[in-house]
């Protein structure tokens, strides 16, 4: 199992714990640890799904917020555990970040893809990666790929969690 380099994970990202808690609450999962989950899902299915979201986001960027980089942004997907039923535990890394996110149930698969791909579409902010612009892009992706009602509901719950997602919000949230 690959180790997680926590050197890029900032303690100043006050939104991080709240966002992960919001994700699990909104998608109906259960928190075992704040950032680690496991999912039995076909590796090929997950790869295809994540690549579809990522490609769609790059072709029609959300508010033209594409991370500017000389290298092509990528979503690194690792096969960690292959089971006899051809499912596996999947781990995803956003480009230039070392946060590892895994999900506990198949219905959380969409959340994992949306969450990580949103990191690839917004400018890097390693000190506070879950700042207002990321939340805005995340909500737009949810509106496109899940539905307007879901996006509105998500942002309403985000307000209850005191997560700032508007332009006048500070990166520390």
Residue locations for each model-derived region?
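Active-site recognition of the HExxH zinc-binding catalytic motif
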Residues: 111-124
């Amino acid at each position: 199992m690959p180790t997680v380099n926590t050197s890029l994970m900032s303690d100043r990202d006050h939104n991080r714990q709240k966002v992960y808690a919001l994700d699990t609450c909104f998608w109906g999962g259960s928190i075992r640890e704040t950032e680690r989950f496991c999912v039995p899902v076909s590796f090929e299915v997950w790869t295809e799904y994540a690549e579809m979201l990522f490609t769609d986001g790059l072709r029609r960027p959300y508010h033209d917020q594409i991370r500017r980089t000389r290298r092509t942004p990528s979503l690194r997907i690792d096969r960690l555990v292959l089971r006899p039923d051809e499912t596996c535990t999947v781990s995803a890394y956003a480009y230039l970040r070392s946060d590892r996110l895994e999900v506990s149930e198949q219905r959380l698969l969409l959340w994992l893809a949306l969450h990580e791909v949103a990191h690839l579409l917004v400018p890097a902010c390693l000190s506070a990666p879950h700042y207002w612009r990321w939340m805005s892009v995340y909500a737009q992706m949810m509106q496109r790929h899940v539905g307007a009602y879901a996006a509105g509901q998500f942002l309403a719950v985000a307000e209850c969690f005191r997560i700032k997602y508007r332009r006048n919000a500070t990166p520390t949230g």
